[in-house]
Design a protein with these regions (language model features):
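Short loop/turn segments that flank or connect secondary-structure elements
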Residues: 3, 10-135
Length: 135
């Protein structure tokens, strides 16, 4: 489904380079999906860059877990899953190894971005929609 394929998604510049390398013709002569959904959806709601989609798209639908502070400042585990994939009750019974832990992959991707940009600058993110020549 494409319910999570929202507009205004951003990617690191290094991810945009991969998309540009594989979909140059689409970006220069194609038109983005209308505002409101991801620019890379076609009229049928399918992803036009699925094979080389960015990380944010690859993690959608997975059973996710992360560690964060609660209101009292205590660290706790949180989990989430798209209700179209399974119920929250099922999610709570999953072993940790069966969940995608948020944090390590994002940090590694950010490190790749930092290593490929001007020293001392913030990691650059680009809106997917802005990759298209035609708006």
């Amino acid at each position: 489904c494409s319910d999570c394929c929202q507009d205004e998604l951003t990617v690191f510049k290094v991810e945009a380079v991969v998309i540009k390398a594989h979909y140059g013709d689409l970006l220069t002569s194609g038109t983005p999906h209308p505002v409101g959904k991801c620019a890379f959806l076609n009229d049928a709601g399918s992803c036009r860059i699925y094979e080389h989609r960015p990380y944010v798209c690859r993690s959608q639908g997975l059973p996710l877990r992360w560690i964060d502070e609660d209101e009292a400042g205590e660290l706790g585990e949180y989990r989430d899953i798209c209700p179209k994939n399974d119920s929250p009750d099922f999610l709570e019974t999953l072993e940790v190894e069966s969940c995608w832990t948020l944090g390590p992959a994002e940090e590694a991707l950010q490190q790749v971005q930092v290593e490929n940009q001007k020293p001392g600058t913030e990691p650059e993110r680009l809106m997917l929609r802005d990759l298209f020549t035609q708006k």
